[in-house]
């Protein structure tokens, strides 16, 4: 069995805000369109893993990616499509495959897919939990040079200070308004 890298991919504003009420607060800002393109270019062709709340916000699976959904309330044994896909090693990008944990998603991808990495795409709580639990091998983080906080009930912030991630790459776009940082475990 091969080992794959689980790579978190997320964005934050200059204050560390990564989400509000299960949404991206910058999604309608024209200055952040670069990041959506970066996300698509980076994840296309690879398996993606998301939490249940992120799954609910999608209308359909993301194209050209095998889509896994972490739902701890759903039994893997009840998922006929994933059992069939594991047996035949044939997954498609028109379905969501439900798993009970990030660990299970990693195991299935390592056993049944020809991939060397998979991306954990959100939501914010799922990504932060993976960082805290040391479940990510790498992290790609976009930082916008702007604050997006508005009066909200449910902001989620990121703090990497207490992790063992080290920066491996840094690139700026849009006249320094968007910064892409790549991290790996130290």
Roles of regions detected by a PLM:
Residues 2-186:
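Enzymes that bind and transform nitrogen-containing heteroaromatic metabolites
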């Amino acid at each position: 069995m091969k080992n794959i890298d689980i790579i978190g991919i997320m964005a934050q504003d200059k204050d560390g805000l990564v989400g509000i009420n299960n949404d991206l607060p910058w999604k309608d800002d024209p200055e952040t369109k670069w990041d959506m393109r970066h996300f698509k270019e980076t994840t296309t062709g690879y398996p993606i893993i998301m939490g249940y709340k992120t799954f609910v916000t999608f209308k359909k699976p993301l194209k050209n990616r095998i889509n896994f959904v972490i739902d701890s309330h759903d039994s893997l044994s009840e998922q006929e499509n994933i059992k069939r896909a594991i047996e035949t090693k044939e997954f498609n990008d028109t379905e969501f495959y439900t798993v009970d944990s990030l660990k299970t998603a990693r195991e299935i991808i390592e056993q049944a897919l020809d991939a060397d990495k998979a991306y954990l795409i959100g939501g914010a709580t799922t990504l932060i939990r993976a960082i805290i639990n040391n479940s990510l091998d790498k992290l790609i983080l976009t930082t916008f040079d702007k604050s997006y906080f508005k009066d909200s009930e449910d902001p989620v912030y990121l703090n990497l200070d207490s992790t063992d991630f080290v920066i491996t790459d840094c690139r700026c776009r849009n006249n320094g308004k968007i910064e892409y940082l790549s991290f790996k475990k130290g």
